[in-house]
Amino acid sequence: MFKYEYDFSIVMGYYNRKPQLTNTLDKFKETYGEYNYEVIIVDDNSTAEHSLDELVKGYDYPINLIKITAEEKGNRINPSTVYNKGFREAKGKIVVIQNPECIHFGNLLGHLRSNLGHNDYFAFSAYNCTSADFTDNLLKNIHLVNDPNFNAQNNICWYNHPTTRPVHYHFCAAMMNDNLKMLGGFDEEFAKGAWFDDNEILLSISVNLGLKIQTLSPDVGFVVHQWHPRDAESKFTQEEHKALIEKNKALYDGYVKYHEEHQMQFPKLLHLYWDGSNFSYLNLLTVLSFNRYHTGWKINVFCPKDPVKTKSWTTNEQKDEYTGKNYFDELNKILNVNIHYIDFNNLPFKHKDASEVIKSDFFRLYVLNKYGGLWSDFDIVYTNNVEKYHKTHVKGDKKMLIYRYLWEEANRYVIPIGLFLGRKHNSILSGILQNIEKFYNPDQYQCLGCQMFQYIFNKENYMNAKPVLQKMKLTELGMQDAQCYLPMKWNELDKMYKDPSVKAVSVETDPDVFGVHWFNGAADAKHYCNNLDLDKLKSSSPQCLIDELVKKYI
């Protein structure tokens, strides 16, 4: 899905470590001549004597030096935003996250190339030197790491080690760039305090991505953490610095507590797709409302680099346009939102000229199968907690959840496609994707959406769908009641847009409901969005359910 120029990006945040970094860069040159890699150094406003402008010119491998100004840095000492600047520039398939003072011993890139998978986070063992003399002696004779006398004098020796101290921190660690993009890097809330950013990213790697975290044995290679003076904290008094630590500790502890109380068998990733058209305030409410009821989730918004403007289908769905204010840039202000611009030429979907609605229907299946998590349309206002709902409503170990409701007049189920929840690489989505070409029809608005799901999963059509179903392990599939996000159906729009008797409390207190799907493609919805006056609504009484839900956020 993402295209990369290098096999590896080695990303490091840097502040006043010039002698140590020189050793690190020299070792790269000595060890990794055969590898396709780049080094990204983000200089967090170092002093003049530690400037790297001339140093980086002395290496024949690509070094991207990014410098942070004094104004941009301010009084911040936490490096989370520093590393994130580097991550956004990383063009390697694998990202190595490390401190500049950590020098490699052994062929670390070779081990990663042969062993790191899409479900892995590897942290290399890190041997610490407690003085400049210990550093000099060890760099001259690396075998001293196994010398009991040297270790007794150097104590504490291992900052990271699979048995002695398995903290898994990123003294030198690696993961696939695809996975790092889904996290968005470090949580920048931690930039306001001190410490605990490394704890949070490990929590996110586990809870949000579901990766296997491990610290590798020194036998496969390790890093030496070269001694350096700790001068970053000197701008604060001891009391001030302690307060910054406590601030981040409270933030981290809050995340841990939330995830312990809201455990979920699916990755905590929310995926959304937007086609580049005008983005209404109601669309924005999908993210604002989700964040009101959820903590510690990562939200990924995917947009096409070159959206197709034509609408190939011959029916009347989604023909009306929203022409009001574009609120899309508001998403950039939300720290847990990552926006990705996708080139469909890099995806295994041959119909590159397909209409955006149809491409988005393919894309939701592809992304959900690749990463797992919750797929949501951009026309759901969340009114409660998704994790809480699924804890009480899902029975058994399910890997894919589809939501449906009974159409009583026709005596069959309707399967809408506004919401899916899945684990990555489940057999349900894999089976559908293997057969996707059977269902593509540019004349049909829902050819890869509701129409396809109705064909596959309604029992009346079992014999026709059997070749597709046989590709699946149906025990992985759970069918949930779509009432949870569709308390009003497509033919009940008046209950949302016109009926003043329908109140928000009815959907906020219902244990079987966690959201309201407001049907962005409907004419009533477009009319509402085009005529919404936030200032007027803020100072007046709501006239309908959607008014009441919107007013909670203005």
Q: Could you tell me what each predicted segment is?
A:
Residues 43-54, 102-103, 305-309:
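A conserved acidic beta->alpha catalytic loop
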Residues 71-90, 358-364:
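Glycine-rich, basic loop-to-helix element that forms the pyrophosphate-binding segment
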